[in-house]
A protein has these predicted regions:
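A short, N-terminal amphipathic alpha-helix
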Residues: 27-43
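C-terminal catalytic/acceptor-binding lobe
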Residues: 188-223
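N-terminal nucleotide-binding beta1-loop-alpha1 segment
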Residues: 1-16, 20
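Short phosphate-binding loop-to-helix
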Residues: 55-93, 100-103
Length: 223
């Protein structure tokens, strides 16, 4: 199983990738890599997908251009979130690059088994440690890559037909993968991660997450 941290997108309000924002002195992407290794993932199986060479200092970069824009209601914008997946035929777990994962979240993602596709996200009722009033997506574990590719194509067809209320992101893709009703989140259809794990939209989000995080130690960081 390969692990690809998705660090693409075009965030116009930022002067640097938000995946490099620091949580307790550690870049978010570096933290994710560290937690994967601490959970037993071989460093040679960890990659970053991006067209930004700055990420080479953290892990091998799989060049992947994704011009996704943050305005999910701008249907006419050419950038699509569904283009974020690096194409491969190998079993692969795709992790959102701007998510601050807890050790337990990474454990759940690594240890969950599937022969098709699994999705990981928060869900109500939320943990007291969670910092947003809505659910957020965190990762996809994909063994059946042809299924993912066909679902992405179908999601984009539905978008062009006007079937979605916004540009499709992880939730809409999962609805297509599971052949669910569109525009409705079925919270019982995926693996729940309910702790402080959450994505970061800005420094204010990071500060909230840091307040909720317990004291954590890492032998790698100590050594």
């Amino acid at each position: 199983m390969k692990y690809i941290i998705m660090c693409g997108g075009n965030y116009q309000n930022w002067y640097f990738p938000r995946q490099l924002l620091e949580v307790k002195g550690e870049p978010i992407v570096a933290r994710t890599i560290r937690l994967l290794k601490e959970r037993g993932v071989d460093p040679e199986d960890i990659f970053i997908s991006s067209d930004n060479p700055v990420f080479k200092q953290y892990a091998p970069v799989l060049h992947h251009e994704n011009r996704y824009e943050t305005d999910i209601f701008d249907i006419d914008n050419n950038g699509l979130w569904t283009d974020a997946f690096y194409p491969t035929d190998e079993p692969c777990t795709y992790l959102m690059g701007d998510v601050v994962f807890s050790p337990d979240a990474i454990k759940t993602i690594v240890e969950t088994e599937t022969d098709d596709i699994e999705f990981f996200a928060s869900a109500p009722p939320f943990s007291p440690l969670y910092t947003k009033p809505w659910a957020e997506p965190f990762a996809f574990k994909v063994v059946n890559q042809p299924h993912l590719r066909s679902a992405i194509q179908l999601t984009q067809i539905f978008m062009r037909q006007g079937a979605f209320r916004r540009k499709p992101i992880a939730w809409e893709l999962w609805q297509v993968i599971k052949t669910q009703a569109l525009n409705v989140i079925e919270y019982d259809s995926y693996v729940h991660i309910n702790d402080y794990t959450c994505d970061v939209d800005g420094p204010e989000d990071l500060a909230k997450i840091e307040e909720k995080m317990p004291y954590e130690t890492s032998m790698e960081r100590i050594g």
